[in-house]
């Protein structure tokens, strides 16, 4: 099982996340979304739900590594489809070791 340390909670829209190695971009319905700084290609984010952890590729939204329960994966993909530009921008910031910007949760 993979365990990641918890990063700081999301802040108000327009805020910038601190310089932790794996800042938390978003949290909703018990799902936590992270992005490493920097990380290996292809561009992706990490989703954690309880004991489950998965790497999700940007664009295709395919699971690269790990797993999530089916309902959780559907919610993560629904959220990611709403925020492709923000995810891509955060990936670029992460690779440049710049602070990341939080993304709104799934409502």
Feature locations, PLM:
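Basic nucleic-acid-binding interfaces
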Residues: 1-5, 9-107
